[in-house]
Amino acid sequence: RQPYHYRNKVQAAFYTDKKGKIISGVYQSGSHHVVGIDSCQTEDVIADKIIVAVRKLLPSFRMTTYNEDTGKGFLRHILVKRGFATNQIMLVLVTGTPVFPSKNNFVKAILKQFPEITTIVQNINPYRTNLVLGDNQKVLYGKGYIEDILCGCRFRISPKSFYQINPVQTEVLYGKAIEFANLKGNE
């Protein structure tokens, strides 16, 4: 019943400011302005660290960030999902183009820092849209999904899958629903 760092899905937008500084975080309400965030009390700690590490790697791989106003650039968003019970970690790199220069070296570099990542997926979103994920994706490392266990059931989680972001409280809520349903076994 942890009130902190419970979000097992974390996403960040990327932007390069006028001074050339790469920022990762969330959009300011009603704008394309990215507010920089390195960590958040509700987000998974490892997910936050992965996002910061990717941001720091971008210049060495000459990767540009996507500009919402011009529709140009490479990296749009990052999505990190972690299985609460399994500790499996998925890194999704949302790009504006399918071409991913130095992808193998980039994958090696991020895995060197975070060997606990079990899969890395490139999701391609070339459209000028507010939707984070595009229709197409490529598995760069691992199986392209993670698994987690919730209420004794195993779930396979893909980049586009909906999955409860707070599994501990979800199990409490589902348990209460079952209790209040007062099931007898012959329904």
Regions found by a protein language model. Name each.
Residues 1-187:
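Accessory RNA-recognition modules of RNA-modification enzymes
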